Structure formats: C-alpha cells, structure tokens
Amino acid sequence: MEGMVVNTHSLRVVNARRTVVELILSDHPADCLSCSKSGNCELQKLAQKLGIREIHFKGEQSTYRKDDSPSIIRDVDKCIMCRRCETVCNQLQTVGALSAINRGFEAVVATAFEQDLVKSPCTMCGQCVMACPVGALSEVNQTRQVIQAISNPKKTVIVQTAPAVRVALGEEFGYPAGTIVTGKMAAALRRIGFDYVFDTDFAADLTIMEEGTELLDRISRYVKGDKDVKLPILTSCCPGWVNFFETNYPDMLDVPSTAKSPQQMFGAVAKNYWAEKLGIKREDMVVVSVMPCVAKKYECQRDEFKTDGNPDVDYSLTTRELAELIKQFNIDFTSLPEEDFDMPLGASTGAAVIFGATGGVIEAAARTAYEIFTGKTLDKVDFTELRGLEGVREATIDFDGTPIHLGIAHGLGNARKLLDSIRRGEANYHAIEVMACPGGCIGGAGQPYHHGDFSIVEKRHEAIYREDANKPLRKSHENPYIKQLYDEYFGKPCGEKSHHLLHTHYFDKSKQVEVEA
C-alpha cells in the first residue's frame, strides 16, 4: 500500500524473532563446546546476534540415533528442520537420499525408512554437510587417528595434498579467499611431524598420462572405424561422481575411464614404488591425504583399493581437518616460511594444479593429448574455452584437423543431464569431465564453509589458474619425475604394470541400495 511504513525492528518484531530462536534452541542440544560446527554454526551466530542468554522454554527434546557412514555423520538431534540438506540433495544434486518425514514434534529430515546413509542412494558428495547451518551433518573426523600414526615410531607417515586445498586453507587463518598458501602448508605439515610431505599434483600428472593414453586409444580406434569403442570417455577422478554413476547408471559402467583418482594413484605408488625405495613393508607405511572432499574418506575404504586388507590410502582429511590439526599443534600458520614439497613425489606441473577447478581435468588432458596425437608442440596451453563456472559447458578443440568434442559438468544434477543425453544417443562428445561439487574440487564439501557466498568459490577458481600460470612446466608429460617413474617402474602408460596398480573397475550398486519397510 502506498505510504505504508514497515518497521522491522520494533519491540514486538524483535521479541518475535527472539521467541522463534529460543523455541529452536529449546529443542537443540547445548553441546556447543564439543560440536563439530562450533564457531561456524549459523544458529549460534543468530543467538549471539539477538542477544539470547537464557532459554525460557523447557520441555521434551527430540532424540534420534546417530548415523555414521564412512564419510558423513548425521546427528539428527541437532537438526532444526531448515531442510537445506534436502534441497541441495534433491534439487542441486538430484540424488534424492534425504527428505522430510513424520509430522509435528517427530518431523525430521532422513533417508527413506530412516535407513543408514550407506543403504541409501547417497553418493557421499557431502554437499548436505556444506549446506547444513548447524552440527546435524558433519564429516567423519580422522585427526585423532592421524596423530596416533605420527606418534608411532614404527610407522613411516607420508602426506599428500590436493590442488584445491592450497587455495582455500588460508581462509581458516584469516587470509582472503583465493590466497595461495602452498609453501606455508608444506611447512606446517612438516612441523606436524609427517616424514614426507608430497603433492597429490604429482599423481594428477600421472593420471593424465594414464587417462590421456586411454582417451587417445579410444579416439584412434573410433577414427579407424571400430564401432565397438565406447565414447565419450568419462573422467573418473571424483568419488562422489563415481558413486553416482555406479548407483544410477549401471548400464554405462564401461564408459568411464578406468584410471584411478589421483588420491588412489598416489597411494598405489607410495605403498609399492616408494615403499620399495625406502626398503620397508607397505604395512609399515601410513598414507594420509588432505582433500577438499568428504567422499574421499569413503573412496580410500573401498575394497578394490586395498592389498590383503591394507589400504593404499589409510586416512583422508578434509581441508577443515588440516586447519584443525595445525591449530592443535599450536602452529602459527601466518609466521611460517615458504617451503617446497619433498621430491620426487612432490614434483608437478600446472596441468595438475587445474584439477582443482571444474574443466581442469579435461584441459590438462587436452594439453598432453594434443601433443601425443599430433606430434606437434602446443604453443598455446590455455584452453580458455574449457574454463568457467556454468553448470554444463561444451567446446571443440582442433587436434590438427581432427575436431575433438568435449563436455564439462559440475554438480550431479548437471551430470545427470549429460548422462541422460548419452543414453538417448544425443551426445556428440569424445570426452566428458564431471565433478560432483559446484565449481569442482574448489567447492568441495571438505573446504572451509562459505555459507552460500559463491564469490568465495570464484576467488578460489581464479587462484587455481594463477598457480597454473606461475608453474615453469604446464603439461603433465613434461614432468621429469613422471618420466623417471615410467622408466624405473611402470614401463609405459596403460602398460601391464600400470594397468594393475593405476586402474580400477566399477560395480553395479543399484541393487545395493536397500529399502526395508
């Protein structure tokens, strides 16, 4: 109505706000000091903002059992029924693992028939954890196990860090979003007590050698008229994405690349090649990864990534857990010097760094595949047409007269669109990159909370490409230590030994989703 004045801060309105928040708090556990979201809890901040110092409402509180999966803990007692997790799971990711059930006081967000997450369609992508404003959803914390391993004199403990971690870790220590803290991170890891500080980027370069060779083999056979070849090839670096297609597209398990993720390739190299170099048994080595991801915790526990029950990667920490570990060791992060990774498994190229952003894996593959396919030097290594933050993108790269059609999707809802188009026979791609999280690994569920401010993800995105541009080598096949690894150990990409250690297979999980009425 014209001339109406709306007072949003009258005593009546302020009291109404306080009453609503007090009612929420009256049915909320008061364990803030030990809660995983302490300091990052939106309910806690709202209570502080409204000056709530006392809860005037008493009564029965909801009680539910905890649901512990390999990656995610659901502490439903802390659920405030905001339903953000349900929204992101159903609308953004199109997974449908979570929904509101029951009515009134018994209402809660849960899986179908209140099954455990591992018995649901959950992909462990963890975007529900990022969306949750309170401590109802959190990652499985493994810092204690890592500290115990470091303290064991009989164990050689090595650590690998993913590319997206270095552009986000600084946020936990007051640095602006997009600050690159690679050197300080390496220094902090040494002071924590890791015996070797390596870089997952090394394994990303290795992934390109394997995945790129596989891609070129499929394309070459297709060009020669082999109609049985499976195209497009799909990337396989993201465990949330792998879980998604194993559960939802079991008829397409022969389409994705068989190359393991960089995390798992690194673990296989560490516990075989590097353990032999050190002259120790794989059982005496502990491999820890630092990832922007919670699904990596699940990935390293998969049976196919173990040898006689011993995992290639023992523990996977999120970026948030690494920040917690640094603080536990009372390390002044901002005062640390810049240090390098240890060699040889710490050497990497710019192509490996861009794995951290959506479109980065396919661009890294294009840099190497072009030179191998054409036999010519690629002068312009920046395929800017593959970059961006649009949910679904496509581009055509000219391989010296041969057009290579590429697709990119980030977010599982966008991945579903591309996979459905492949099923219908409408897709005209040679290769597709998929990442489960918005923005790729930079927007992973293990990164510092951005509370819906996507500009933070955009700044991390910019930082990834700055780091790439500053690298002296920017093509994976130019990494001298990768060449050395093949000369000394694997022989050639996609050879017998590399196929045994660096490749995997997939499973039909559509029947593993248990529904018990």
PLM regions with names:
Residues 1-17, 21-25, 38, 139-517:
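Iron-sulfur-associated redox domains of electron-transfer enzymes in respiratory
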Residues 130:
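Conserved glycine-bearing catalytic or ligand-binding loops at nucleotide- and phosphate-handling centers
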Residues 1-124, 137-149, 156:
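Fe-S ferredoxin-like electron-transfer domains
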